């Protein structure tokens, strides 16, 4: 099975910031996430996405105003929207990320039986998927852990870690790279999704093509890295197709990790990645 390598040559195809005109010409995205337990995840996603688009809208769980205050303390480049208004903003957004920091408690993982908090996340996610099946979706975090693969809109991006991969697809990621590439390709084709794995060699496939993203280092095992990738993916998706966006997001994060490792070894975290990714992007002279 033929695989292709995503590198700087591919990055040069990026359409972000190529057609700048009015205030909204770089695109608009909505991010839905956050909870009393997980308010760091959406901050990382918001920071990553907001540097790539004209407008970033954020919706958090209804009634959890403290979540918004905590997030605003670390970031001001977004517009908070009330849960009752989320449909309107999803409708006008070019791409939507759902899941970072949403509650995902399970009673029974493989059959998606959830407690009250997980059930709320599931209800919200399914409602939006039903209303906006044609939207560019990036599905991650809490949502990815409480919905069945058949619930996810066709053409959507999923960015599972190894545990989430097994939960969603019912099988473990294979160890061998060639076997894993074929596995991801077949699952993407079967379910009509775009899958991005987060490995030493990350794999992205839409069931038609297989792209390999090499690089990075052991510093990427830190918590929050997936939220950075998800945020970059939705930001890039405002101006690019989804398969390119996830490949580019993975590439930028891996290159940022390499740059940080040169300066401080593996003593960096997801916050550091968010700050260094723009330097990597700028250095590409796109």
Q: How would you label these PLM feature ranges?
A:
Residues 18-82:
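Substrate-binding N-lobe of the ribokinase-like
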Residues 212-224:
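Short pre-catalytic strand/loop immediately N-terminal to key active-site residues, enriched for Gly-Thr
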Residues 180-189, 242-257, 270-278:
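Short, well-structured alpha-helical segments that form the helix of a local strand-helix-strand
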Residues 74, 257-286:
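Charged C-terminal helix
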Residues 167, 222-252:
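Short, small-residue alpha-helix embedded
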Residues 1-23:
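Positively charged, low-complexity intrinsically disordered leader regions
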Residues 2-7, 57-215, 282-286:
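Glycine-rich phosphate/dinucleotide-binding loop and adjoining beta-alpha-beta core of small-molecule
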Residues 31-34, 100-107, 237:
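Glycine-rich phosphate/diphosphate-binding loops and the adjacent beta-loop-alpha structural elements
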């Amino acid at each position: 099975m033929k695989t292709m390598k995503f590198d700087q040559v591919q990055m040069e195809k990026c359409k972000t910031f190529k057609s700048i005109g009015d205030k909204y010409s770089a695109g608009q995205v909505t991010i839905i996430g956050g909870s009393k337990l997980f308010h760091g995840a959406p901050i990382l996603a918001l920071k990553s996405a907001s540097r790539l688009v004209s407008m970033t809208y954020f919706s958090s769980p209804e009634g959890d105003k403290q979540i918004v205050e905590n997030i605003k303390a670390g970031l001001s480049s977004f517009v908070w929207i009330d849960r009752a208004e989320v449909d309107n903003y999803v409708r006008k957004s070019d791409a939507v990320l759902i899941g970072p920091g949403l509650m995902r408690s399970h009673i029974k993982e493989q059959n998606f039986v959830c407690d009250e908090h997980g059930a709320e996340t599931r209800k919200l996610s399914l409602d939006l998927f039903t209303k906006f099946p044609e939207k560019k979706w990036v599905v991650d975090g809490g949502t990815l852990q409480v919905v069945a693969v058949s619930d996810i809109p066709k053409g959507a991006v999923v960015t599972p870690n190894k545990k989430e991969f097994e939960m969603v697809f019912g099988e473990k990621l294979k160890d061998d790279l060639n076997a894993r590439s074929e596995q991801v390709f077949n699952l993407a084709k079967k379910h009509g999704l775009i899958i991005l794995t987060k490995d030493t060699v990350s794999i992205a496939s839409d069931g038609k093509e297989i792209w390999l993203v090499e690089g990075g280092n052991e510093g990427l095992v830190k918590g929050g890295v997936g939220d950075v990738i998800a945020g970059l993916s939705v930001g890039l998706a405002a101006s690019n197709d989804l398969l390119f966006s996830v490949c580019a997001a993975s590439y930028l994060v891996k290159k940022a990790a390499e740059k940080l490792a040169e300066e401080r070894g593996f003593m960096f975290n997801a916050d550091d990645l968010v700050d260094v990714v723009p330097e990597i992007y700028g250095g590409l002279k796109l």
